[in-house]
Protein backbone atom coordinates (compact mmCIF):
# COMPACT_ATOMS: atom_id res chain seq x y z
CA UNK A 1 0.00 0.00 0.00
CA UNK A 2 1.23 3.48 -0.83
CA UNK A 3 1.59 5.65 2.29
CA UNK A 4 1.87 9.44 2.34
CA UNK A 5 2.70 11.84 5.16
CA UNK A 6 -0.44 13.42 6.58
CA UNK A 7 -0.21 17.07 5.46
CA UNK A 8 -2.96 18.15 7.83
CA UNK A 9 -1.80 16.87 11.22
CA UNK A 10 0.07 20.03 12.21
CA UNK A 11 -1.45 22.51 9.77
CA UNK A 12 -1.81 25.90 11.45
CA UNK A 13 -4.50 26.87 8.92
CA UNK A 14 -6.83 24.23 10.40
CA UNK A 15 -6.35 25.13 14.07
CA UNK A 16 -8.76 28.07 14.21
CA UNK A 17 -11.65 26.61 12.23
CA UNK A 18 -15.13 26.62 13.77
CA UNK A 19 -15.63 23.19 12.20
CA UNK A 20 -15.85 20.62 14.98
CA UNK A 21 -16.37 23.31 17.63
CA UNK A 22 -19.53 24.31 19.48
CA UNK A 23 -20.64 27.61 17.94
CA UNK A 24 -23.36 30.17 18.50
CA UNK A 25 -25.56 30.96 15.52
CA UNK A 26 -25.68 34.61 14.53
CA UNK A 27 -28.78 35.90 12.79
CA UNK A 28 -27.37 39.26 11.71
CA UNK A 29 -24.92 39.75 8.87
CA UNK A 30 -21.27 39.08 9.69
CA UNK A 31 -18.73 38.53 6.91
CA UNK A 32 -16.04 37.61 9.45
CA UNK A 33 -17.73 34.23 9.97
CA UNK A 34 -16.28 32.98 6.67
CA UNK A 35 -13.11 30.91 6.94
CA UNK A 36 -10.80 29.73 4.18
CA UNK A 37 -8.48 26.71 4.02
CA UNK A 38 -5.37 27.00 1.81
CA UNK A 39 -5.62 24.74 -1.23
CA UNK A 40 -1.84 24.37 -0.99
CA UNK A 41 -2.21 21.99 1.98
CA UNK A 42 -3.60 19.19 -0.15
CA UNK A 43 -1.80 20.07 -3.36
CA UNK A 44 1.60 19.76 -1.73
CA UNK A 45 0.64 16.27 -0.57
CA UNK A 46 -0.19 15.14 -4.11
CA UNK A 47 2.84 16.85 -5.63
CA UNK A 48 0.97 19.66 -7.33
CA UNK A 49 2.94 22.86 -7.62
CA UNK A 50 3.22 25.60 -10.20
CA UNK A 51 0.77 25.32 -13.09
CA UNK A 52 -2.10 22.98 -12.29
CA UNK A 53 -2.74 19.98 -14.59
CA UNK A 54 -6.47 20.79 -14.63
CA UNK A 55 -8.92 23.65 -14.65
CA UNK A 56 -12.35 23.74 -13.09
CA UNK A 57 -14.53 25.04 -10.33
CA UNK A 58 -16.11 24.22 -7.00
CA UNK A 59 -19.88 24.46 -7.47
CA UNK A 60 -21.79 25.13 -4.26
CA UNK A 61 -25.57 25.03 -3.92
CA UNK A 62 -27.20 26.66 -0.91
CA UNK A 63 -30.81 25.72 -0.17
CA UNK A 64 -31.25 27.74 3.03
CA UNK A 65 -30.59 31.31 1.91
CA UNK A 66 -32.95 33.81 3.50
CA UNK A 67 -32.94 37.50 4.43
CA UNK A 68 -35.39 40.33 5.14
CA UNK A 69 -36.51 42.83 2.52
CA UNK A 70 -36.54 46.56 3.22
CA UNK A 71 -39.92 46.22 4.96
CA UNK A 72 -38.77 43.36 7.18
CA UNK A 73 -40.55 40.62 5.25
CA UNK A 74 -38.58 37.37 4.87
CA UNK A 75 -37.28 36.37 1.44
CA UNK A 76 -35.97 32.93 0.43
CA UNK A 77 -33.81 31.86 -2.49
CA UNK A 78 -31.46 29.15 -3.74
CA UNK A 79 -27.81 30.11 -3.97
CA UNK A 80 -25.38 28.85 -6.61
CA UNK A 81 -21.70 29.72 -6.22
CA UNK A 82 -18.85 28.79 -8.54
CA UNK A 83 -15.40 29.20 -7.01
CA UNK A 84 -12.42 29.12 -9.36
CA UNK A 85 -9.85 26.47 -8.46
CA UNK A 86 -7.02 28.97 -8.77
CA UNK A 87 -8.23 30.74 -5.63
CA UNK A 88 -5.78 30.70 -2.74
CA UNK A 89 -8.34 29.14 -0.39
CA UNK A 90 -11.25 26.79 -0.54
CA UNK A 91 -14.17 27.86 1.65
CA UNK A 92 -14.75 25.81 4.77
CA UNK A 93 -18.34 24.59 4.69
CA UNK A 94 -19.44 25.09 8.31
CA UNK A 95 -18.21 28.67 8.24
CA UNK A 96 -20.12 29.15 4.98
CA UNK A 97 -23.30 27.87 6.67
CA UNK A 98 -22.81 30.16 9.67
CA UNK A 99 -22.18 33.10 7.34
CA UNK A 100 -25.37 32.42 5.37
CA UNK A 101 -27.33 32.13 8.62
CA UNK A 102 -26.19 35.64 9.47
CA UNK A 103 -28.34 36.93 6.61
CA UNK A 104 -31.53 35.62 8.23
CA UNK A 105 -32.44 38.72 10.24
CA UNK A 106 -30.64 41.27 8.08
CA UNK A 107 -32.45 43.71 5.80
CA UNK A 108 -31.37 44.09 2.17
CA UNK A 109 -32.94 46.46 -0.33
CA UNK A 110 -32.86 44.01 -3.24
CA UNK A 111 -31.78 40.60 -4.52
CA UNK A 112 -28.96 42.39 -6.31
CA UNK A 113 -27.68 43.78 -3.00
CA UNK A 114 -27.62 40.26 -1.55
CA UNK A 115 -25.79 38.94 -4.60
CA UNK A 116 -23.21 41.73 -4.52
CA UNK A 117 -22.59 41.16 -0.80
CA UNK A 118 -22.12 37.43 -1.30
CA UNK A 119 -19.78 37.95 -4.26
CA UNK A 120 -17.61 40.43 -2.37
CA UNK A 121 -17.33 38.39 0.82
CA UNK A 122 -16.75 35.00 -0.80
CA UNK A 123 -14.09 36.38 -3.15
CA UNK A 124 -12.32 38.00 -0.20
CA UNK A 125 -12.35 34.76 1.80
CA UNK A 126 -11.22 32.59 -1.10
CA UNK A 127 -8.79 35.16 -2.50
CA UNK A 128 -9.99 34.28 -5.97
CA UNK A 129 -12.70 34.59 -8.59
CA UNK A 130 -16.26 33.78 -7.55
CA UNK A 131 -19.48 33.71 -9.55
CA UNK A 132 -22.69 34.05 -7.55
CA UNK A 133 -26.26 33.41 -8.70
CA UNK A 134 -29.28 33.98 -6.45
CA UNK A 135 -32.26 31.99 -7.75
CA UNK A 136 -35.61 33.44 -6.77
CA UNK A 137 -38.72 31.29 -6.08
CA UNK A 138 -40.28 32.28 -9.40
CA UNK A 139 -37.50 30.29 -11.08
CA UNK A 140 -37.54 27.24 -8.78
CA UNK A 141 -39.53 25.29 -11.37
CA UNK A 142 -36.45 25.34 -13.63
CA UNK A 143 -34.41 23.31 -11.13
CA UNK A 144 -33.81 19.77 -12.42
CA UNK A 145 -32.80 16.40 -11.01
CA UNK A 146 -30.52 14.40 -13.31
CA UNK A 147 -28.28 11.34 -13.38
CA UNK A 148 -24.57 11.72 -13.92
CA UNK A 149 -23.60 10.96 -17.52
CA UNK A 150 -22.02 7.66 -18.45
CA UNK A 151 -22.07 4.00 -17.48
CA UNK A 152 -22.53 3.21 -13.79
CA UNK A 153 -19.97 0.68 -12.51
CA UNK A 154 -21.69 -0.01 -9.18
CA UNK A 155 -23.32 -3.28 -10.23
CA UNK A 156 -19.98 -5.07 -10.65
CA UNK A 157 -20.14 -8.21 -8.48
CA UNK A 158 -16.95 -7.80 -6.46
CA UNK A 159 -15.93 -8.83 -2.96
CA UNK A 160 -14.54 -5.94 -0.93
CA UNK A 161 -12.44 -6.35 2.22
CA UNK A 162 -10.40 -3.14 2.25
CA UNK A 163 -11.75 0.31 3.03
CA UNK A 164 -8.58 2.31 3.68
CA UNK A 165 -7.52 4.68 0.93
CA UNK A 166 -5.13 2.90 -1.43
CA UNK A 167 -4.22 4.15 -4.93
CA UNK A 168 -2.41 0.86 -5.55
CA UNK A 169 -5.78 -0.54 -6.60
CA UNK A 170 -5.11 1.26 -9.89
CA UNK A 171 -1.77 -0.45 -10.57
CA UNK A 172 -2.06 -2.48 -13.77
CA UNK A 173 -5.50 -0.99 -14.14
CA UNK A 174 -5.52 -0.39 -17.89
CA UNK A 175 -5.39 -2.32 -21.13
CA UNK A 176 -2.65 -0.55 -23.14
CA UNK A 177 -3.84 -2.24 -26.34
CA UNK A 178 -7.27 -0.61 -26.15
CA UNK A 179 -7.57 3.15 -26.46
CA UNK A 180 -11.05 4.39 -25.67
CA UNK A 181 -13.09 7.48 -24.94
CA UNK A 182 -15.73 6.73 -22.32
CA UNK A 183 -17.62 8.09 -19.34
CA UNK A 184 -18.06 6.09 -16.14
CA UNK A 185 -19.79 6.94 -12.88
CA UNK A 186 -20.35 5.62 -9.39
CA UNK A 187 -22.70 6.47 -6.53
CA UNK A 188 -20.50 4.66 -4.01
CA UNK A 189 -18.09 7.47 -3.22
CA UNK A 190 -17.86 8.11 0.51
CA UNK A 191 -15.18 9.97 2.37
CA UNK A 192 -15.10 11.63 5.78
CA UNK A 193 -14.78 15.22 6.90
CA UNK A 194 -11.15 16.10 7.53
CA UNK A 195 -11.89 17.67 10.92
CA UNK A 196 -14.98 15.92 12.34
CA UNK A 197 -14.82 12.54 10.52
CA UNK A 198 -18.52 12.86 9.71
CA UNK A 199 -19.42 10.92 6.54
CA UNK A 200 -19.52 12.72 3.20
CA UNK A 201 -21.65 10.91 0.61
CA UNK A 202 -21.16 11.52 -3.08
CA UNK A 203 -21.42 10.42 -6.68
CA UNK A 204 -18.53 10.78 -9.10
CA UNK A 205 -18.15 10.87 -12.88
CA UNK A 206 -14.92 9.98 -14.66
CA UNK A 207 -14.73 10.92 -18.33
CA UNK A 208 -11.48 10.06 -20.05
CA UNK A 209 -9.61 9.22 -23.20
CA UNK A 210 -6.68 6.82 -23.18
CA UNK A 211 -5.95 3.18 -22.31
CA UNK A 212 -9.13 1.39 -21.25
CA UNK A 213 -9.51 1.43 -17.46
CA UNK A 214 -10.34 -1.80 -15.65
CA UNK A 215 -13.72 -0.96 -14.12
CA UNK A 216 -13.32 -3.35 -11.21
CA UNK A 217 -10.03 -1.74 -10.23
CA UNK A 218 -11.54 1.72 -10.55
CA UNK A 219 -14.46 0.73 -8.32
CA UNK A 220 -12.14 -0.72 -5.68
CA UNK A 221 -10.12 2.48 -5.75
CA UNK A 222 -13.20 4.66 -5.29
CA UNK A 223 -14.47 2.46 -2.46
CA UNK A 224 -11.09 2.85 -0.74
CA UNK A 225 -12.00 6.46 0.06
CA UNK A 226 -14.62 5.12 2.47
CA UNK A 227 -12.50 5.69 5.61
CA UNK A 228 -10.43 8.54 4.16
CA UNK A 229 -10.54 11.93 5.88
CA UNK A 230 -10.30 14.84 3.46
CA UNK A 231 -12.41 17.71 2.19
CA UNK A 232 -14.54 17.12 -0.93
CA UNK A 233 -12.39 19.32 -3.16
CA UNK A 234 -9.23 17.57 -2.05
CA UNK A 235 -10.64 14.10 -2.74
CA UNK A 236 -11.54 15.03 -6.31
CA UNK A 237 -8.09 16.46 -7.00
CA UNK A 238 -6.52 13.32 -5.54
CA UNK A 239 -8.67 11.13 -7.83
CA UNK A 240 -7.65 13.22 -10.84
CA UNK A 241 -3.93 12.98 -10.05
CA UNK A 242 -4.09 9.24 -9.36
CA UNK A 243 -5.94 8.47 -12.59
CA UNK A 244 -3.45 10.48 -14.63
CA UNK A 245 -0.54 8.75 -12.90
CA UNK A 246 -1.73 5.15 -12.84
CA UNK A 247 -4.02 5.01 -15.87
CA UNK A 248 -2.20 7.38 -18.26
CA UNK A 249 -5.38 9.15 -19.30
CA UNK A 250 -4.61 11.52 -22.17
CA UNK A 251 -7.77 13.52 -21.42
CA UNK A 252 -9.59 13.46 -18.10
CA UNK A 253 -12.52 14.97 -16.24
CA UNK A 254 -13.44 14.14 -12.64
CA UNK A 255 -16.72 15.58 -11.38
CA UNK A 256 -18.22 14.75 -7.99
CA UNK A 257 -21.53 15.80 -6.51
CA UNK A 258 -21.85 15.39 -2.76
CA UNK A 259 -25.02 15.29 -0.70
CA UNK A 260 -25.83 18.42 1.24
CA UNK A 261 -25.02 19.16 4.85
CA UNK A 262 -26.33 22.20 6.66
CA UNK A 263 -28.24 23.19 3.55
CA UNK A 264 -25.11 23.24 1.35
CA UNK A 265 -23.81 20.81 -1.22
CA UNK A 266 -20.33 20.92 -2.77
CA UNK A 267 -19.66 19.72 -6.31
CA UNK A 268 -15.99 19.88 -7.37
CA UNK A 269 -15.19 19.74 -11.09
CA UNK A 270 -11.70 19.16 -12.51
CA UNK A 271 -10.80 18.65 -16.18
CA UNK A 272 -7.91 19.08 -18.56
CA UNK A 273 -10.02 19.28 -21.72
CA UNK A 274 -13.60 20.46 -21.19
CA UNK A 275 -15.65 23.02 -19.30
CA UNK A 276 -18.12 22.42 -16.44
CA UNK A 277 -21.69 21.52 -17.37
CA UNK A 278 -24.76 23.34 -16.15
CA UNK A 279 -25.19 22.56 -12.47
CA UNK A 280 -28.12 20.20 -11.90
CA UNK A 281 -28.57 18.24 -8.71
CA UNK A 282 -28.75 14.48 -8.35
CA UNK A 283 -31.59 12.62 -6.63
CA UNK A 284 -29.68 12.26 -3.34
CA UNK A 285 -28.96 15.96 -3.17
From Swiss-Prot:
This protein's record includes keyword Acetylation: no
Reactions this protein catalyses: 7-aminomethyl-7-carbaguanine + 2 NADP(+) = 7-cyano-7-deazaguanine + 2 NADPH + 3 H(+)
GO biological process: queuosine biosynthetic process; tRNA modification
Protein residues bound to NADPH: 93-94, 261-262
Gene Ontology CC terms: cytoplasm
Localization, UniProt: Cytoplasm
Sequence positions that bind substrate: 91-93, 232-233
Pathway, per record: tRNA modification; tRNA-queuosine biosynthesis
Domain of life: Bacteria
Catalytic residues (positions): 193 (thioimide intermediate), 200 (proton donor)
Keyword Iron-sulfur included in the entry's annotation: no
Pfam family, one: QueF
The entry's keywords: Cytoplasm, NADP, Oxidoreductase, Queuosine biosynthesis
Any GO molecular function: preQ1 synthase activity
Enzyme Commission number(s) from the entry: 1.7.1.13
NCBIfam families: QueF (TIGR03138)
Protein family: Belongs to the GTP cyclohydrolase I family. QueF type 2 subfamily.
Function: Catalyzes the NADPH-dependent reduction of 7-cyano-7-deazaguanine (preQ0) to 7-aminomethyl-7-deazaguanine (preQ1).
Subunit: Homodimer.
Name the UniProt record assigns to this protein: NADPH-dependent 7-cyano-7-deazaguanine reductase
The species this protein was found in: Shewanella frigidimarina (strain NCIMB 400)
Amino acid sequence: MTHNHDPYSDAAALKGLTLGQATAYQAEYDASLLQGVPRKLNRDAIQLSGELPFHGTDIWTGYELSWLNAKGKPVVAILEVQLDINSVNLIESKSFKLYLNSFNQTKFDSVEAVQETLSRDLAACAEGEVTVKVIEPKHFNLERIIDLPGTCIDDLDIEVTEYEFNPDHLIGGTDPDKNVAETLNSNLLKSNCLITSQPDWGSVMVRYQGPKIDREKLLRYLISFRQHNEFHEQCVERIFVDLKKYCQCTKLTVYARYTRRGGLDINPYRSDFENPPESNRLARQ
